[in-house]
């Protein structure tokens, strides 16, 4: 059963590392496979106050959302060999991957929901520093690495928005 909290922490660390070093690191180069994140997704979210209409379309064609879903699927498959020896860990990682896509999609279709439930992600897209707030589902690893930067967003004029993530329900 220790695999569940370890899997959740590992997945949150993975969000941080992948977002910071792959999506923003490699993704800033237009020639990179990962450029969709910076050049499509971030542009849309900034221009439309967090909304990325591409999430309203079905997962078809070759676009930012299908690339994101494919990367999550490949990541899930990479953990498959661990299933016989660490089923709770793998289950928690797979849950985290599915939850990541669910909340990330919802955040970019419903900005008011994002402000209430993922203020750190709103800060990532609409705040002054897009090179902070790397976590999407929970700000745990951002807090550990001191990359959680609270800023004003278009939805809330002041206050601490995200220092107590456990107090915010996801549903």
Provide a role label for each language-model segment.
Residues 1-5, 89-90:
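Hydrophobic alpha-helical transmembrane segments
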Residues 4-12:
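N-terminal amphipathic/basic helix or basic patch
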Residues 11-164, 171:
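Membrane-embedded catalytic scaffold of the fatty acid hydroxylase/desaturase
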């Amino acid at each position: 059963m220790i695999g569940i909290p370890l899997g959740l922490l590992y997945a949150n660390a993975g969000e941080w590392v992948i977002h910071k070093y792959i999506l923003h690191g490699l993704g800033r180069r237009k020639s990179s496979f990962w450029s969709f994140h910076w050049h499509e997704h971030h542009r849309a979210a900034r221009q439309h106050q967090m909304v990325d209409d591409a999430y309203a379309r079905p997962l078809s064609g070759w676009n930012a959302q299908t690339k994101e879903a494919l990367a999550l699927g490949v990541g899930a498959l990479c953990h498959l060999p661990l299933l016989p020896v660490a089923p709770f860990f793998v289950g928690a990682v797979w849950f985290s991957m599915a939850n990541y896509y669910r909340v990330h999609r919802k955040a970019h279709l419903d900005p008011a929901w994002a402000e209430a439930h993922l203020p750190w992600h709103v800060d990532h897209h609409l705040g002054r520093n897009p090179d902070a707030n790397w976590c999407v589902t929970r700000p745990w690893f951002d807090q550990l690495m001191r990359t959680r930067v609270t800023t004003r967003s278009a939805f809330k004029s002041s206050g601490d928005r995200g220092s107590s993530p456990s107090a915010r329900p996801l549903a």
